[in-house]
Swiss-Prot record:
Residues 456-491 are annotated as: Disordered. This is Moesin/ezrin/radixin homolog 1. The keyword 4Fe-4S does not apply. GO terms for molecular function: actin binding. It comes from Culex quinquefasciatus.
Length: 572
């Protein structure tokens, strides 16, 4: 018989025998994908009644109520959740599977997530998928086909696809330099503080017949009112429970406190009680295991994971250095190109100045020629005047008429000489001015020639630097399989401290995250459509108004002795 197993990011097909057990199929899956943290996961199938059910490891696959088909369909999913992802998840493959499953639950609204948190989570999801933001390759519209936000959040805000993309991209740029695995981890660290994260809900009734929800998670059992799955009203940590059992539809939980009555509720069907029992046993075992020293196998896994992470970090740092070297080389190349362009512009200006100076020199030379001609003309006229004056002095006995005529000629010649003297004076002044301009032009000509020479002899090696340092980043994950077992009687230790006593949300511990969420909330409020508000939105808003969060609520509902809480449950 063929079976198809769908993980969060792959489809696997196997051929099994009639005798193949659930564990044998499970082991084959985890070996194929390289998963060693097997205790969190299980194989899920749809039974003949259409309900999702976890495969029983020690029964034959073919004897279980798997919906018929060829191939038989199974989903490989996380069945149990860690208390703290940062402390417990070891392998990259485990991290990735949890990340994809939680992300899918948030996007499909199985886990309620406020709008501002949804946008911040989306920015980490983009970093996990695409790596660092690059404005050259990540152009507008790049995220148009990515499913990043719950449809509820999109419907509640009057924002275009471009506006959503801009909002997400703004925060995406904040994560520059973050490894993809680190982005997934940051996503989960924020998501695990959501009220519905990791909770399996079951419809139950108390002895009065009141319809309620039972929530089973890594921290214990919680009771919810029918119309509010965000805010538990009564809580029982695993450390207070010593035994669980059921008889038909009646489910019985025996507290460690022997003075307290049994905690009894009723499920609609026996099969529901079986699922509750299995989840309680698994979660309780993991709860107790976390409070014991790590096994040798887990220690080895953690050591290997640290080595792989360090190697990956070193490779990342090497890549960052290479990228930085490349950026420096590109910057120097750009500076060189800018310098060449500036030099070319300077050459053009210098060439223009050179032409202007040469033109001015030509004009000056022409002016000097004209000045010299005027001076020669003046000298000739002065000589002619002197000849006339000499003649006049030598012809004292000349007749009066001739003498008068000569005097008129001398006077006219004197006027001509005076006029020419003035012209020479003007030309002389103009020549001096032109000489000064020529000196300036020659200086510019010298500078232009020097600039031209410098531009044509500047070294051209500034753009070459460390090109050989560029490398590609390869990321691999490997692993083996492990084992787990269950018990109906719980190991107990009354000295175990309730982990929620000191637990704080990441936003409460991290001021930067708190400020980011606050800024996002303010931005989104401007486009919010209050008519699209859901019941969960209203409940969340009221919880925030009253200063409640996941762990504050859990601390509050676990106060008082067990008897008081059992009585409170009976009276709901």
């Amino acid at each position: 018989m063929n079976v198809r197993v769908t993980t969060m990011d792959a489809e696997l097909e196997f051929a099994i025998q009639q005798s193949t057990t659930g564990k044998q199929l499970f082991d084959q899956v985890v070996k194929t994908i390289g998963l060693r943290e097997v205790w969190f996961f299980g194989l899920q199938y749809t039974d003949s009644k259409g309900d999702l059910t976890w495969i029983k490891l020690y029964k034959k696959v073919m004897s279980q109520d798997v919906q018929k088909g060829d191939p038989l369909q199974f989903k490989f999913r996380a069945k149990f959740y860690p208390e703290d992802v940062a402390e417990e998840l070891i392998q990259d493959i485990t991290l990735r599977l949890f990340y994809l499953q939680v992300k899918n639950a948030i996007l499909s609204d199985e886990i309620y997530c406020p709008p501002e948190t949804s946008v911040l989570l989306a920015s980490y999801a983009v970093q996990a998928r695409h790596g660092d933001y690059n404005k050259t390759t990540h152009t507008p519209g790049f995220l148009v086909n990515d499913r990043l936000l719950p449809q509820r959040v999109i419907d509640q805000h009057k924002m275009s696809k471009d506006e959503w993309e801009n909002s997400i991209t703004t925060w995406w740029q904040e994560h520059r330099g973050m490894l993809r695995e680190d982005a997934m981890m940051e996503y989960l660290k924020i998501a695990q503080d959501l009220e519905m994260y990791g909770v399996n809900y079951f419809e139950i009734r108390n002895k009065k017949g009141t319809e309620l929800w039972l929530g089973v998670d890594a921290l214990g059992l919680n009771i919810y009112e029918k119309d509010d799955r965000l805010t538990p009203k009564i809580g029982f940590p695993w450390s207070e429970i010593r035994n669980i059992s059921f008889n038909d539809r009646k489910f019985i939980i025996k507290p460690i406190d022997k003075k307290a009555p049994d905690f009894v509720f009723f499920a609609p069907r026996v099969r529901i009680n079986k699922r509750i029992l299995a989840l309680c046993m698994g979660n309780h075992e993991l709860y107790m295991r976390r409070r014991k020293p790590d096994t040798i196998d887990v220690q080895q896994m953690k050591a290997q994971a640290r080595e792989e992470k360090n190697a990956k970090q070193q490779e990342r740092e090497k890549l960052q250095l290479a990228l930085a070297a490349r950026e420096r080389a590109e910057k120097k190349q750009q500076e060189y190109e800018d310098r060449i362009r500036n030099m070319q512009e300077e050459m053009e200006r210098s060439q223009a100045n050179l032409i202007e100076a040469q033109d001015m020199i030509r004009r000056l030379e022409e002016q000097l020629k004209q000045l010299q001609a005027a001076k020669d003309d003046l000298e000739q006229r002065q000589n002619e005047l002197q000849v006339m004056i000499t003649r006049l002095e030598e012809t004292k006995n000349m007749e009066a008429a001739e003498r008068a005529k000569l005097e008129d000629e001398i006077r006219m010649k004197q006027e001509e000489v005076h006029k020419i003297q003035e012209e020479v004076s003007v030309k002389d002044s103009e020549t001096k001015r032109l000489q000064e301009e020529v000196e300036e032009a020659r200086r510019k000509q010298t500078e232009a020639a020097a600039a031209l020479l410098a531009a044509t002899t500047t070294p051209s090696h500034h753009h070459v630097e460390e090109e050989e340092e560029m490398d590609n980043e390869e990321e691999l994950v490997n692993g083996e399989n492990g084992n787990q077992d269950f018990s109906k009687d719980f190991d107990t230790d009354e000295h175990i401290k309730d982990p929620v006593e000191e637990r704080r949300t990441l936003a409460e511990r991290n001021e930067r995250l708190h400020d980011q969420l606050k800024a996002l909330k303010q931005d989104l409020a401007l486009s919010r459509d209050d008519t699209m508000e859901t019941a969960n939105d209203k409940i969340h808003r009221e919880n925030v108004r009253q200063g409640r969060d996941k762990y504050k609520t859990l601390r509050e509902i676990r106060k008082g002795n067990t008897k008081r809480r059992v009585d409170q449950f009976e009276n709901m």
